[in-house]
């Protein structure tokens, strides 16, 4: 690899945790939150989703990215089976404490699944 960065995933997690406070902000009353975040001085709480995640916690987006990275690093690219991804997604979800933030349907599946195979069986395309 020409420009290897062993901390890239860490930086992605940090950026996701930082930017979460600005997700979906559109109203005038949210300008203060947006302004505070854009100063880049500290992690901020989301003004609407206060129950969702405390400031500085990464989101479901990063959790899934970590799971996908684990699969690619551990299994390479020649044997990528859906079951490997499902097992790893479920493992990361449980390792992260079952964090909220996924779409309601997928959150429900992750909460109910007992295994990667069970998760795949419950998914309805």
Language model features: what each stretch is:
Residues 1-125:
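Structured, active/binding-site neighborhoods that engage oxygen-rich ligands
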